[in-house]
Curated annotation (Swiss-Prot):
Pfam families: CRCB (PF02537)
GO biological process terms on file: cellular detoxification of fluoride
Record localization: Cell inner membrane
InterPro entries in the record: FluC
Protein name: Fluoride-specific ion channel FluC
HAMAP family: FluC
Gene name per UniProt: fluC
Keyword Cell cycle assigned: no
Amino acid sequence: MKFDTMLAIGIGGFIGAILRAYTAGLVNSAVKHDIPFGTLSVNLIGSLLLGMFIGAIQYGGIQNPYIKSMLTTGMMGAFTTFSTFAVESFFLFKNALYIQALSYILLNVIGCIILAGAGFKGIEAILK
């Protein structure tokens, strides 16, 4: 991988990580619940946005390879978080919050797939 591509990914990652911390913190401070809604919200928002970015890339709305890498691998890669989702799911089970754990897992997995598809199809409808 070329250095300039890695730099673009790093810039996107910097932006995505800051946006993730801010968004998750904002949601967690507003919503007090056993389910970690901060992580859920960044995963759902990130899946929607990634679907939109991939749609824009596929249909020619985003052509610059550095912008592609910055937005997808960098920004959305840092904004969303599978590892935190996994650890939070583990602790919900560990604390015997089985309904919350299963709800959290289903909301993440199914919600993210639906929103990624919706983002892609929305951009497809605009750019196709």
